Amino acid sequence: VPIVMVGGATGQIGDPSGKSEARVILSKEVVAHNAECIRKQLSRFISEDNAIFVNNAEWFNNMLYLDFLRDIGSKFSVNKMLTAESVKMRLETGLSFLEFNYMILQAYDFYMLNKKFGCKLEMGGQDQWGNIVAGTELVRRLSQQEVHGITMPLLINSSTGQKFGKSVGGAVWLDKNKTSVFDYYQFWRNTDDADVQKLMLYFTALPVDEIRNICSASINRAKEILAFEATALAHSGEEAAKAYLAAGAKFGFSDKENKIPTSSAIAKINTDEAVIDDLPTYELTLPAEGIWFPKLMAEAGLCKSNGEARRLIQGGGAYLNDQRISDPDFTAKAADFPNGSAI
C-alpha cells in the first residue's frame, strides 16, 4: 500500500537541498492550508481507499524540543551531516540552524512511517539522497530494522539548468485556480526542444517507439501531443481538448490533417471547432513607449506583483505569442501585438 505524506510540519522549515539561499518562511496557517490542498490534489490521482495519507504534523506538533534533542538528536553526527551536498553548498552563502535541522526531521519521518505503518522504502528526487540515507540509519539505530531508499533524476529545464519546482519559479500548479487549464497546456506546449522526448516518456502513456517517431517527424507536433496528454492527465481529456483547440485557433496547428500517426486521443479532435472564446482576456490601452513586461503580467492578473513576474521570467516561465521572454526588463510594444492582440 503506498503511503503519501505531506509536510505540514517540515513545510514550516523548508528543505535546503538544491537551494542557494534560504526559503521564504510561511506562517503555520498557510502551511496547514497548503498541506490540505496538496492532499486533495493528490487524491485525484491516488485513491484514498488504496493508499495511506498522512501529515507529519501529527507527530511533530506535540513533540517537546528537549525530548527530540535527547532521543533523536543524539543519534546524528554533525561531522557527517556537514558532508551532505545540501549542506556543503550552503555553508559559503549561509545556512540557518533551522534549515540544518531539516535532515533530522525527514529522517524521523521515515522512522515514524516505519513504526506506524511498516514502511520499508522511501522514494524521492535525487537531491533527497542524503536525507533518505539519514532516515535509513535512524530506523536501523532505533528499531534495528533494515529499510531502503530509492531516488529518481530531477526534472531539469535544459534552457535554465534549474529543476522544475514551485520555489524556483516558472512552475505550474495542478489547481486550476492557480494555473488555468490553458496556461497549464501552454506550459507543456512551450517545452524546450531538447526536453520534449524525455517529458513525453515521463508524462504520457504512448509507446516508446511512437514517441521517438513523433519527435523525429515534427518536434512541434510532439509538443502539442505532450501538452494534450499532460493536460488530460491533470484535468481530463475534455479540458485538454478545449485547450488544444484554443491554442490552435490562435497559433495554428502543427498537424491539422493528422498526417503523423499517433495513438493519442488528440488525433480524434475536430480542429474545425477551434475557437478562442475560452481564453481569459485582459484589455489595455498601450502607451506609445510600450509597457514593462512584468508590469503587464501583474496588471493582467498573471502574477500578484511585479517582483513575482520578474521571478517568473527569470525562471523561464513567461511567454509572449509562443516566444519565451527571458529579459525581466523587456518592454512590450505595439509590434508585439499583431492585430491588436497577443497571448
Residue locations for each model-derived region?
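Short acidic-hydrophobic sequence patches enriched in Asp/Glu that either
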Residues: M5, S27-N34, K176, S180, ...
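Short connector loops/turns at beta-strand edges and beta->alpha or beta->beta junctions
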Residues: G7-G11, F110, N177
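Conserved nucleotide- and phosphate/pyrophosphate-binding catalytic cores
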Residues: L142-I343
